[in-house]
């Protein structure tokens, strides 16, 4: 066992790549370490493609093991269960930049597994996993046009760009961006920002690509020293004769079909033509398979649509390259929801609903770094009917999780701070129609639904999806792409933001050669489109409603002395339980004495506040209270006049005349009016019944000395 180790400096940290010691039966395996973070990345490739398979079966699995942080998993079974949202999102993050680098026609199954085996809880292991995947593919010998590099980029006005910031640095950073690419090209960007201008965002992409060159060089050197022989794989030769025949027979008809603006009608026509092509060419005599005909038919579609776009001809739905589809906005569409919006852009539609909950509705996430509370949830649902199909209904898929997180990133920067608006927020985007850019429709709909619910957003947010078609004779950047343009194009570029700047940016590029100029043009067009969409949204709802929805819970925050917390909670929680049950409210108390009270309506809220106020209230000298006699003694009576507070009415303070026997005047359980005369240094309270009665009657009693309590 002779492991080969490659070390290199990456920013202010040393990265170690090791192969040949662990997982030696995998096609490629690399243990990557950055500081105390270690991720084992393995790649296995099937030697042959499955018969009849017409797609590339790449699967990426990122998994975080509890032992990496010195923890034992919770739950009954005490072992890791289904992938968390973080693991799913990181799996997608690794998948996206490597998928376009496998050669065209390579259909062998490839499985990537990245296992976090150690973490210092100070930095996200995702960058280490991406670097390790690149290195494992590089040494595996599997056909792969890499290696790739990956970098996380932060930004502050004081420091500028920050390479691979820690969790602590990200707390003050205005940007959290992950960039991945090859030596010559950026392939993937995933980011969230606090309304940063386009030039800062583009600069971050270029900075990340420049810095990751150290990673790419190290992976290439590791492959040179420890790599396996590259597979002797050749793509199946294209049947040029069949391709020419299909083009001659169906080229014009396909071109006409792509001038049908209605998606369903266009798909029906293309389906008919595809079936005709299969019937004509996939015969027993020819020996040509139906899959081969369908594949070349798809290639013909691809070439026809792209050539028209580059030639600046009208797009599939008749638009030019910069026009946004017609937009329709409705808010308040669901009467009992706290906030709702129906956002329609062309044939893409999202019904988005916002719900306000109390502090106890937060999502508690168990992760390697410890327990995290998430007070803003955004869930994206993509039912099969949205594209006119029957499909599987079940657990949330990776795509839905990824689109939901992108929409969440777009909106998160404009949410109010928890201190001023301590609601838990849940937004659900139901995609009811889809023809491209449903995640960006979710951003627009989420902004509108939150404003409709009365959530005080800093500014409205809109999102737009851009596309690119690049050929040898030129390129075209497309605004507001359709589903077909996404599928047939070279880039998917999604930007969300306000009038002031970008809040989220996601980019996936399928080809090399995307220049700084192209990205700059795409960002400029996206800005113009975003401002147009915001203008359409503002015609219906330009700012948050002045108050939260009548259907939403009411809340108020009060501050009490921390010593009073135990009084509100009571013995075994009896007091707080009594308040919440009797007033139908929810109470959340922080250790610093911050009390958040939630109730379904103002009446219940006020009742709960009154109960709390009475418990924490201090006796005020000179104030008159109504109390209950709780105990009679020879020298007077003890009266409970505030929750948890009793005071002494001395025998001389019961009546104007001389009182010989207290029981002749008072009984236990009797309700009386008392006036607070004094509170001594030991907190003992002196009360008077006769002064309370005299003050209410408007006469001043004769002055008498008040005896001390014995």
UniProtKB/Swiss-Prot annotation:
Protein name stated in the entry: Polyribonucleotide nucleotidyltransferase
GO molecular function: 3'-5'-RNA exonuclease activity; magnesium ion binding; polyribonucleotide nucleotidyltransferase activity; RNA binding
Cofactor names: Mg(2+)
Top-level taxon in the UniProt lineage: Bacteria
Subcellular location, record wording: Cytoplasm
Record flagged with keyword Zinc: no
Keywords noted in UniProt: Cytoplasm, Magnesium, Metal-binding, Nucleotidyltransferase, RNA-binding, Transferase
Matching CDD domains: KH-I_PNPase, RNase_PH_PNPase_1, RNase_PH_PNPase_2, S1_PNPase
Pfam families assigned: KH_1, PNPase, RNase_PH, RNase_PH_C, S1
Family matches, as HAMAP family: PNPase (MF_01595)
Domain KH: 553-612
PROSITE patterns hit by this protein: KH_TYPE_1 (PS50084), S1 (PS50126)
Family of this protein: Belongs to the polyribonucleotide nucleotidyltransferase family.
Chain sites annotated for binding Mg(2+): 486, 492
Organism in which the protein naturally occurs: Cellvibrio japonicus (strain Ueda107) (Pseudomonas fluorescens subsp. cellulosa)
């Amino acid at each position: 066992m002779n492991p080969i180790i490659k070390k290199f400096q990456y920013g202010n940290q040393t990265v170690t790549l090791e192969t040949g010691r662990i997982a030696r039966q995998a096609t490629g395996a690399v243990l990557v370490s950055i500081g105390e973070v270690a991720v084992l990345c393995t790649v296995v490739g099937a030697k042959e493609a499955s018969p009849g398979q017409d797609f590339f079966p790449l699967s990426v699995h990122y998994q975080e093991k509890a032992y990496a942080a010195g923890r034992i998993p919770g739950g009954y079974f005490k072992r890791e269960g289904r992938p968390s949202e973080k693991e799913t999102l990181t799996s997608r993050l690794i998948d996206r930049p490597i998928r376009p680098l496998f050669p065209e026609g390579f259909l062998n199954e490839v499985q990537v597994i990245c296992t976090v085996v150690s973490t210092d809880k100070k930095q996200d292991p995702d960058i280490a996993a991406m670097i390790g995947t690149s290195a494992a593919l590089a040494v595996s010998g599997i056909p792969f046009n890499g290696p790739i590099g990956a970098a996380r980029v932060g930004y502050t006005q004081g420091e500028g760009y920050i390479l691979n910031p820690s969790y602590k640095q990200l707390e003050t950073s205005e940007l959290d961006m992950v960039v991945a690419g090859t030596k010559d090209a950026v392939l993937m960007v995933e980011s969230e920002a606090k309304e940063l201008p386009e030039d800062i965002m583009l600069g971050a992409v270029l900075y990340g690509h420049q810095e990751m060159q150290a990673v790419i060089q190290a992976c290439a050197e590791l492959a040179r020293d420890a790599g396996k022989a590259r597979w002797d794989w050749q793509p199946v030769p294209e049947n040029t004769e069949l391709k020419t025949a299909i083009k001659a027979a169906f080229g014009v008809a396909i071109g006409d079909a792509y001038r049908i603006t209605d998606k369903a009608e266009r798909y029906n026509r293309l389906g008919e033509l595809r079936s005709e092509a299969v019937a004509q060419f996939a015969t027993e005599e020819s020996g040509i398979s139906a899959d081969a005909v369908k594949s070349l038919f798809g290639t013909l579609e691809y070439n026809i649509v792209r050539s028209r776009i580059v030639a600046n001809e009208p797009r599939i739905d008749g638009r030019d390259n910069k026009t946004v589809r017609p937009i329709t906005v409705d808010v308040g569409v669901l009467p009992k929801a706290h906030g709702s919006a129906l956002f329609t852009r062309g044939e893409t539609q999202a019904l988005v609903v916002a719900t306000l909950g109390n502090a106890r509705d937060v999502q508690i996430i168990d992760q390697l770094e410890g327990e995290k509370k998430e007070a803003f949830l955004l869930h994206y649902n993509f039912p099969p009917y949205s594209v006119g199909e029957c499909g599987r209904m079940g657990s949330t898929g990776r795509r839905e999780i990824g689109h939901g997180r992108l929409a969440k990133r777009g909106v998160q920067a404009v949410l109010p701070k928890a201190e001023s608006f301590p609601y838990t927020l849940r937004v659900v985007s139901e995609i009811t129609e889809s023809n491209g850019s449903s995640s960006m429709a979710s951003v627009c709909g989420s902004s509108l639904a939150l404003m409709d619910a009365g959530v005080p957003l800093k500014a409205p947010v809109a999102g737009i999806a851009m596309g690119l078609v690049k050929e040898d004779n030129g390129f075209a950047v497309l605004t507001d792409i359709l589903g077909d343009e996404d599928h047939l194009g070279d880039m998917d570029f999604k930007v969300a933001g306000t009038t002031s700047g970008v809040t989220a940016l996601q980019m996936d590029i399928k080809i090399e050669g995307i220049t700084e100029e192209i990205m700059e043009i795409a960002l400029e067009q996206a800005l113009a489109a975003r401002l147009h969409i915001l203008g359409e949204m503002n015609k219906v709802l330009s700012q948050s409603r002045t108050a939260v929805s009548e259907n939403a819970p009411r809340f108020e925050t009060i501050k009490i002395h921390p010593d009073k917390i135990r009084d509100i909670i009571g013995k075994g929680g009896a007091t707080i339980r009594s308040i919440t049950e009797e007033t139908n409210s929810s109470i959340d108390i922080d250790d610093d004495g911050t009390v958040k009270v939630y109730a379904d309506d103002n009446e219940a809220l006020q009742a709960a506040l009154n109960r709390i106020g009475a418990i924490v209230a201090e006796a005020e000298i000179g104030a008159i209270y109504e109390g209950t006699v709780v105990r009679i003694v020879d020298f007077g009576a003890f009266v409970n006049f505030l929750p948890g507070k009793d005071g002494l009415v001395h025998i001389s303070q019961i009546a104007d005349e001389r009182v010989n026997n207290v029981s002749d005047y008072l009984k236990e359980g009797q309700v009386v009016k008392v006036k607070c005369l004094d509170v001594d240094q030991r907190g003992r309270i002196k009360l008077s019944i006769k002064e309370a009665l005299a003050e209410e009657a408007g006469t001043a009693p004769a002055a008498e000395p008040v005896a001390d309590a014995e």
